[in-house]
Amino acid sequence: MSEIEIGRGKRGRRAYSFDEIAVVPSRRTRDPEDVSVAWQIDAYHFDIPVMGAPMDSVMSPATAIALGRLGGLPVLDLEGLWTRYDDPEPFLDEIAQLDPIRATARMQQIYAEPIRPELVTERLRELRAAGVTVAGALSPKHTQSHWRTVLDAGVDLFVIRGTTVSAEHVGSRAEPLNLKRFIYELDVPVIVGGAATYTAALHLMRTGAAGVLVGFGGGAAHTTRRTLGIHAPMASAIADVAAARRDYLDE
């Protein structure tokens, strides 16, 4: 792929968002009755290609159950308000009514409440009792302190999620999570991400992850682009990660 010069000593390449590309028909058509959008990750089968984002603004226990019954994969945010408060609905309603400037400060106050292990267990067991696939998400930072609680609650799929996650995190304040060792020793499949480049995705796949989440600030719900002014356009990110998967399967 050709590169462009950004400045002296700095080169890059053109990346594309979904709005900048179009999908065109190929030379072969197929009967709609023969088409299936079902998919599978590890031993878990899903009828529709939809994975619920682990965000308080998207996924409550009730929403997760509804999505699971429709055939999708619901993922509950185990660091959200549902694992910090017995009833977070009043806080969510309050945040929704505030202007963006006041909402940010208020959210910081509300999310200062610590994660309660008993609520992590309760929320995941709600999903289990409803008969849907149980998936919960933690950031790498909180995975080391809460993974046992999540596992004991009977999670089916463990999601390790951050704005961007790498297989080789470096930090001086605490021992980084060793993804490869953690995934190897865990008894349930692990999905990790986000990743937005070929190399980062390939390294995550080599840890033994069952799935890799794609994206860095380029999605419709991301605030990274507005806040920091940086993002990876999603069409190119998906294409790069798909290429990494093909090469990983050939290894």
For each predicted feature, which ranges?
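Active-site entrance/lid segments in N-terminal catalytic domains of soluble metabolic enzymes
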Residues: 1-249
